[in-house]
Amino acid sequence: MARLERDTLRRRPDELSGGQQKRLCIARALAAQPQHIIFDESFSGLDVTLKKQVLDFLKELQTELQISFLVITHDLDTAMYMAGTIHVMRRGKIIETLEHPKSFSDFQEPYSQELVKAVRSKRRALQ
């Protein structure tokens, strides 16, 4: 299920890769057979390649096990990739809800648009 080799269970956490550690945490959560799992900034420390692998793995699990995820993130790219519904919050209140957004242009609230601008400027800086 978590795509971990058997010897992983005998290894210490510091002997596991970042991806193995994340998958082990997910496997531990799945052992309780939940209907919902909350991921609170769970992907922020991962490099782009590893993050994509973990997110793809989660999407497969979501389909296979019919469970829902609540993904709390400051990363709009992750939100767009994972979410069916996105709630944008500011100062503890939901200010915008998007159902199955297709692109960043779907965001309409001024604060949401500022977040999108920040993502775009970060992308330009990295190029």
Write out the residue ranges for each language-model feature.
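Conserved ABC ATPase signature
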Residues: 12-16, 20
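H-loop/switch region of ABC-family ATPase nucleotide-binding domains
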Residues: 73-74
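A short, surface-exposed alpha-helical micro-motif characterized by mixed small hydrophobic
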Residues: 79-81
